[in-house]
Amino acid sequence: MEVDLLHFEKKYHNCIVAGIDEAGRGPLAGPVVASAVIVDNANIITGIKDSKKLSKKKRELLYEQITSNYVWATAIISHTEIDDINILEATKKACSIAVANLSLEPEIVLVDGNMQFKDERFVSIINGDNLSLSIAAASIVAKVTRDRLMLDLSAEFPQYLWHKNSGYGTKEHIEAINIHGLSPYHRRSFRCC
């Protein structure tokens, strides 16, 4: 049975609805990125789904379409702030900033996962990136934005292979940390080796 990715957007059809998702909660290095997207229900881009289910090439193509056709905003919280306030609080902060940065103020904000926010507009949806077009679009924008940042950082620190692992704790990444030590972009609060 195919899922109606506009189910939640239709449920709040009289409201401006934003979807929000993050990329980078689990990596050992780099920032956490949250993106918010307001989908234009009269201009549905085909192929949008959870970023993890798309090839890099398809994500890049959809990123260009989403950012050219929909209202969107992104927020980036650095690795140092993650260490200062913890990854959960950093993620929530990035989500709140991304929503605040939208050029339209949403009345409802659909959030992937089970994070709780004080702002009553925020509605958490477990597995939301598979159930909401807005959240799926946000997952693509967040993932592509973060991957591009990690690609830039990889040019400065190629030994960690961030162009391949995006800062996640792959075997090769951990081996590089054991050989070269931590870079300035590694999260000190994440125990990795």
From Swiss-Prot:
Alphabetical UniProt keywords: Cytoplasm, Endonuclease, Hydrolase, Manganese, Metal-binding, Nuclease
UniProt binding sites for a divalent metal cation: D21, E22, D112
Main subcellular localisation: cytoplasm
EC number: 3.1.26.4
Single GO MF annotation: manganese ion binding
Top-level taxon in the UniProt lineage: Bacteria
Name of the top EC class for this enzyme: hydrolase
Gene Ontology biological-process annotations: DNA replication, removal of RNA primer; mismatch repair
Keyword Manganese carried by entry: yes
Cited PROSITE patterns: RNASE_H_2 (PS51975)
Cofactor: Mn(2+); Mg(2+)
InterPro entries named in the record: RNase_HII, RNase_HII/HIII, RNase_HII/HIII_dom, RNaseH-like_sf, RNaseH_sf
Location(s), subcellular: Cytoplasm
SUPFAM superfamilies the record matches: Ribonuclease H-like (SSF53098)
Cofactor note: Manganese or magnesium. Binds 1 divalent metal ion per monomer in the absence of substrate. May bind a second metal ion after substrate binding.
Domain RNase H type-2: 15-193
HAMAP family, alphabetized: RNase_HII_B
NCBIfam families: PRK00015.1-3
Record's function text: Endonuclease that specifically degrades the RNA of RNA-DNA hybrids.
Stated family: Belongs to the RNase HII family.
Identification of the protein by name: Ribonuclease HII
Organism: Rickettsia conorii (strain ATCC VR-613 / Malish 7)
